[in-house]
Amino acid sequence: MCFIDMASHRPVPADDFGAYYNLAECADYDSLPESKTQPHFQGVTGLRNLGNTCYMNAILQCLCSVSPLVEYFLSGKYITALKKDCSEVTTAFAYLMTDMWLGDSDCVSPEIFLSAVGSLYPAFLKKTQQDAQEFLIYVLNELHEALKKHCRRRVNEKRTGQSCCRKVPAQETSIITRLFEGQLSYSITCLKCESCTHKNEVFTILSLPIPSDYECSLQDCLQCFFQQDTLTWSNQIYCSFCEIKQEAAVRTTISKVPKIIVFHFKRFDIQGTVKRKLRTDIHYPLTNLDLTPYICPVFRKHPMYNLCAVVNHFGDLDGGHYTAFCKNSVTQAWYSFDDTRVSEIPDTSVQTATAYLLFYSCQPFSIPAQKRKSQDSTPDHCKQAIRKWP
């Protein structure tokens, strides 16, 4: 299973923060006043920049804020899936989450995790700027592949206006699919004979168009994504009833809502040789995001979502910088993560014009259950793999 633009003239070095903080867009949030002694809380840990790896650090901080995912690794549940097959990425991810939640340091290095990912995707070892959304897809896919198991499940299908339920062949599920996987349903209506067919597609990230160059809301982006499309001319589809290509109307709804829904804003616009970044100020709610208008009525459960993490992007297509805002389940406070720099921020500062990815949860996060750090039951073959890493 596979889950499914940057143009400054000078790439900014990994630790050259001054160039970014001179940008107006980088000064749109304030941290809370620092006390003389900053207490260290679980899950509030900085990450070292290993050379243009801010994209990775921002994604790791967001995943570190997803308590059900963290609990799965801290409790050792992932180890059962690795008894026979060792995934270096998964093992390194588990060790990193443990360090970020149970370690004593204010900052840790993700070098081992980057090395494991880079062994599969060498592009991430080049110390060049990468796209945070693409990195998230790679990480979720690798974790799913390592932790998946086969099971039979029921799938609902809508036929001729009625809902039916049928068994399907074994499906591959994991902690990743249980948390992040949703399903889109496409209703395709032939405009000639009015026959209707349906198609389903799973997703882990929804990439949303931005309908304005200046200012809009998340709801505006969602309405643009889910608006009915008409397929004409070269986009006509084959109608099995008419036995010829016809114009068609396509309506998209959500037929399965995920526990964690990730929105990606299409800020990078590339048309031929012309590249630009859309700097639209997108307003998004911190609480009570209602997706009911976009959910198929048959499966409607009226879930309300609360924001739990944000990935911000500063700069342009070929040279930019990523940071993250994450809500901690222990303190219930928001924190800004800028590589090794960590600071608490007020709720009012979470809304920025630089948001690139939004993580929403339909359930409040609790403090992750965990084993003692000394209780290491990692399989021996995984430990041997770890010893090979730098």
Curated annotation (Swiss-Prot):
Q: Which domain of life is it from?
A: Eukaryota
Tell me the name of the encoding gene: Usp50
Arranged from A to Z, the UniProt key words for this protein are:
Cell cycle, Cytoplasm, Cytoskeleton, Hydrolase, Nucleus, Protease, Thiol protease, Ubl conjugation pathway
Q: Which GO terms describe its cellular component?
A: centrosome; cytoplasm; nucleus
Q: Which InterPro entries does the entry mention?
A: Papain-like_cys_pep_sf, Peptidase_C19_UCH, Ub_carboxyl-term_hydrolase, USP_CS, USP_dom
Q: Which PANTHER family does the entry mention?
A: INACTIVE UBIQUITIN CARBOXYL-TERMINAL HYDROLASE 50 (PTHR21646:SF11), UBIQUITIN CARBOXYL-TERMINAL HYDROLASE (PTHR21646)
The keyword Hydrolase belongs to this UniProt entry's keyword annotation: yes
Q: Report the record's Gene Ontology biological process terms.
A: nuclear speck organization; positive regulation of interleukin-1 beta production; positive regulation of interleukin-18 production; positive regulation of NLRP3 inflammasome complex assembly; protein deubiquitination; proteolysis; regulation of cell cycle G2/M phase transition
Q: Which residues cross the membrane?
A: none
Its localization reads: Cytoplasm; Cytoplasm, Cytoskeleton, Microtubule organizing center, Centrosome; Nucleus
Molecular function GO terms recorded: cysteine-type deubiquitinase activity; ubiquitin-like protein peptidase activity
Q: Supply the source organism for this entry.
A: Mus musculus
Q: Where is the USP domain?
A: 45-363
Known catalytic reactions: Thiol-dependent hydrolysis of ester, thioester, amide, peptide and isopeptide bonds formed by the C-terminal Gly of ubiquitin (a 76-residue protein attached to proteins as an intracellular targeting signal)
Give the protein name, as stated in the record.
Ubiquitin carboxyl-terminal hydrolase 50
